Amino acid sequence: MPLIEVSNLRKTYGEHVAVDDVSFHVEQGEIFGILGTNGAGKTTTVECLQGLRTPDSGTMSVLGLDPGKDHTALRQRLGSQLQESRLPDKIKVHEALDLYASFYANPADTGDLLAKLGLTEQRDKYFGKLSGGQKQRVSIALALVGRPEVAVLDELTTGLDPHARRDTWKLVETVRDTGVTVLLVTHFMDEAERLCDRLAIFDAGRVVATGTPGELRDRAGKSTLDEAFVSLTGRD
């Protein structure tokens, strides 16, 4: 049984249709990508999955729970790093982790988590003094501190230099290798091709294709995921 199931999801804001008849599923232990340009409905979809927004229609199941009705129980089993989340500049790294750990009944050991993510030396540094890559490592640590079964990572590498992006990719793979299922939201084609076992391509609030990167390339008759995306979204 899939860990995440979405069926015919729809969400509007006034006259604007943000998500329109979206369906997909995520299997245990995979990195599943939600790929699309800005405004495609990616973030709205994952916010609905976390119980942060209420869809107009459709059904969702995350770890066998309804995000709308069971959001308190779901928060104990799902970790998230959202696109717009940001810590105060004057909070220290260990203070942020201790704060987030206090939200969970059985949190991870924060010292071990800092060590695994290469943040031990930054433990007493203020968040505002960290590099972009270090801030993203902290974001991943906060998403993992509750020992989640599913981690939602939204536009994780936006604004990072190429070296920091590749370091972050390795961390995401490490997270998956510990048994955590990852829902990765991105607009970077190379990131999706490198990391995702399967993915859903979003365009104008709809899912236009799902599959492995190789399946999507083959379906479009293209040699790269970038070219396949352009073809499948009708932009060529």
Predicted regions and their residues:
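Conserved ABC ATPase "signature" region
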Residues: 98-102, 107-122
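Helical segment within the ABC ATPase nucleotide-binding domain
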Residues: 165-178
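ABC ATPase "signature
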Residues: 210-211
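Catalytic Walker B motif of ABC-type/P-loop ATPase nucleotide-binding domains
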Residues: 151-155
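Hydrophobic anchor residue at the start of the ABC signature
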Residues: 140
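Conserved ABC transporter NBD signature motif
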Residues: 58-66, 73-74
